[in-house]
């Protein structure tokens, strides 16, 4: 769960911006989108292989 503490002199807009950034870094929305529909084991393997290729490109 992403949490952001708002400082006394901090505006709501900047706190909201920080919250959105922490949610994006945690990957919460991406995970929710993945769980919208059932993903077969083959699709899961394919998605992980593509992510692995992106992370470690061939030289």
Swiss-Prot record:
GO molecular function list: structural constituent of ribosome
Entry keyword set: Ribonucleoprotein, Ribosomal protein
The UniProt record lists the keyword Transferase: no
Any GO BP annotation: translation
A cellular-component GO term for this protein: ribosome
Domain of life: Bacteria
PROSITE patterns in the record: RIBOSOMAL_S21 (PS01181)
Gene3D superfamilies reported in the protein's UniProt record: Ribosomal protein S8 (1.20.5.1150)
Short name of any one Pfam family annotated for the protein: Ribosomal_S21
Similarity comment text for this entry: Belongs to the bacterial ribosomal protein bS21 family.
Name this protein carries in UniProt: Small ribosomal subunit protein bS21A
Organism the protein comes from: Gloeobacter violaceus (strain ATCC 29082 / PCC 7421)
